[in-house]
Amino acid sequence: MVHITLGQAIWVSVKPIIKIYLIIGVGFLMAKMGILTVEATRIISDIVLTVLLPSLSFNKIVANIEDKDIKSVGIICLSALLIFGSGFFFAYVVRLFLPVPKQWYGGILAGGMFPNISDLPIAYLQSMDQGLVFSEEEGNKGVANVIIFLTMFLICIFNLGGFRLIESDFEYNDDESAVRVSETTKTQPAVSANTTNTDTSERFFSNEQQLFNNKYTARDSLTEAIGTKGENADVPPISRRSTNSIAPLSLPDTSSNSKITKPVQVKARNTIACTQSEESQATRGSNPLDSQSSASTIHSYNTSESYESSIDTMRARRTASQPRAYNTTTLLEENCLDEKCPKNMSMAALEPIRSIDMRALPSQNIHHLIREYSNVDQYGHQRRNSSLRGADMNDVHSISSNSTLQTIKTANLTRILTSDATVSKKDIETSGESLPQWMRKFSLTPLLVFFLKNCLRPCSMAVIIALTVAFIPWVKALFVTTANTPHISQAPDNAPPLSFFMDFTGYVGAACVPFGLILLGATLGRLKIGNLYPGFWKAAVTLVILRQCVMPIFGVLWCDRLVKAGWVNWQDDRMLLFVIAISWNLPTMTTLIYFTASFTPPETTAPIQMECVSFFLMLQYPLMVVSLPFLVSYFLKVQMNL
C-alpha cells in the first residue's frame, strides 16, 4: 500500500476542486457573454440526459461491474437512502425551528434531500486516478459506483415523485384573482414626447433589449390573453399601446375557454418606439450602428411599399374559411398592422432574434430561465405549444400532420423522457388512461404506470441494460474481456464482437461531465439574490452547514460501520467506501432550479421560490471548496491510513 504525506494528501484533495471550478467558471463566463443562452443551456442539457449520460453509464457499468459486485450495488442503494433521509431530516428540523417562507416549505425539503450526485463526484474521481492514490481501474469502478448513486437519485426524484415536494409550493390564480387586459392596459405608461430628444444609440439598444425580453413574453401574453367563450365573447377594447407589445403575431388555441385575460404580474412594454426623429435619422442614414452593420435584428422599413407587401403576404396566408375562433386575433392583427401602427414599423417584432445578436444585449437572468423552463400559466394550466403561435396556416397544417415521427415527437411520453423538468402531478394522474376500466379503478394504477414510464428514461434504461449485461458473464464477454468473463470467439481484430459499441459509448460519454459542469456554471451565472424572506438567511446558512459540515461526519461513521459489520473491507473496497464518503458532502442538486422554474408562471415578477433556491445554492458552492478537500484529506490519512 502506498503511503503519502499530509501535504500530498491535501494537494491531491484540492487539485480536483481547481479543475472543477475552472470548468464551472467557463460556463459562468459563457453565460455572462451571451454565448450560452438559456435556450442553448436547455438544448445541451437535454443532449446530456438523452445521449451523453446514458452512454457514459452503459460504458462504465459494463466495463467495471461484475456479478460479484451485486453486494456493492445493494450497499450503494442503502447508502443513497440514508443520504436522502438524513438530508430530509435536517431540512425538516430547519423548517420547523427557523424562518422559512411557506411558499418554499416543500422546496427546502427537496433541497436538503437530493445532492448533486452526478457530474461533481465523477469529475473529482477522474482527477484522482493518476496512480498516486487510486489506479485508473479503481477510478473507472468509482465512476460506475457514482452512476448507481445517480440511478437511485433518478428513481426517487422522478419515479417515486420526489418532484412533488417542489410542485406543492405553488398556488396559482383563479378566474377571480386574475386581472383583465383592460385593467392592465390602464397602467401602461404613455410614450412621452420628450423621448424624441434621446440619443439615437441609447434608444436603439433600449429597443433591442425590449424586443429581447418580449421574445419570451409577447407570444404567451397574447395567446393566453385571447380566448373565446363562444361566438359572442365579450372582448374589451385593446389599445394601441397593448398591441404594440405583441410580437410575433399568434393564433389562439381554439380549445381555450378562458375569457380575455392577462396575468397580474405582466409588465406592459412598448416594444417599438417609432418617433419622427428616428424616421428622419434612418432616412439620412445617420444611425452609426446601421452604418457599421452592427449585430442587430431591427430592420426599419422606410418605404410603405415594403411594409404593405409584408402585411399582404401575411394576410394571404389566412384561409377564407377561417373559423370564428380566430376572429379576435385577426382583428387585433389588422388593427396593429394597419392605421394604428406607423408605416416604418420595425419588422423585428415579427422575426426572432438571432442568437449571435443576443450577445450584444444584457446578460440573461433568472427571469429568462423561468420563461424558458416554465410549463404553466398563471392558472396552473399547462402552457400551450409555443411553436404553434405565430405560425401560418401551412405550418400549422404540417405540424398537425399524422406522420409517425410527428406523433412520436408530440407524445407526452416523449416530453417526459427527453427532458429533466417537464413532469408534474397531472402526469401522474393521467398515467394509465389507456388501460382497461377494470385496471384503472385501482388507486395505485396511475402511480405504477408513472413509475414504469420513468424507467424508460434513457439513463435509467442504460443502467438497467448495463447491469443486466454486467451480471451475466457470457453476455458481458460480447462487449469486454476481463479475467472473469468466459472465452468466446473474437472478432477479426481479436476484440469482443460488440466492442465497437463500447468504443461508441466511451467516446460519446466522455463529453458528459465537462458539458455538465459547464451547464452548472452557466446556471449559477444567471442566479441572483433578491429580496429574501425576513430571517430566511438563518435557515439557509444553518441547513448548508448541516449538509456540508455535519453530514460528512455521518458519512465517515457509516463507512466505519460497514467495515466493522464485515460487509466491506479497506483492501478490496476502498474505492467504494471513498465514493460513499464524498457523497455525503455534495451540494444540492442543480435540477432543483429547473424544477422550480418549471412550476413558476413566466409572468411572475417576484418569484420567491426562485429567490430562495438561488440564495441556498449560491451558499453551498463556495463552502464546498473547503469542506470537500478537508473531508478527503481526513479520509485518506485517517480512515484509509495512507
Curated annotation (Swiss-Prot):
Residues 240-260, 272-312 have a biased composition (Polar residues). It is found in: Membrane. The chain crosses the membrane at residues 16-36, 43-63, 74-94, 105-125, 143-163, 461-481, 500-520, 539-559, 575-595, 615-635. It comes from the Eukaryota. InterPro entries: Ecm3-like, Mem_transp_PIN-like. The keyword Ribosomal protein does not apply. It is a multi-pass membrane protein. Residues 183-206, 227-324 are annotated as: Disordered. Its main location: membrane. Keywords: Membrane, Transmembrane, Transmembrane helix, Transport. GO terms for cellular component: endoplasmic reticulum; membrane. Residues 37-42, 95-104, 164-460, 521-538, 596-614 are extracellular. Coiled coil: none annotated. Residues 1-15, 64-73, 126-142, 482-499, 560-574, 636-642 are cytoplasmic. GO terms for biological process: transmembrane transport. Belongs to the auxin efflux carrier (TC 2.A.69) family. This is Uncharacterized transporter YNL095C.
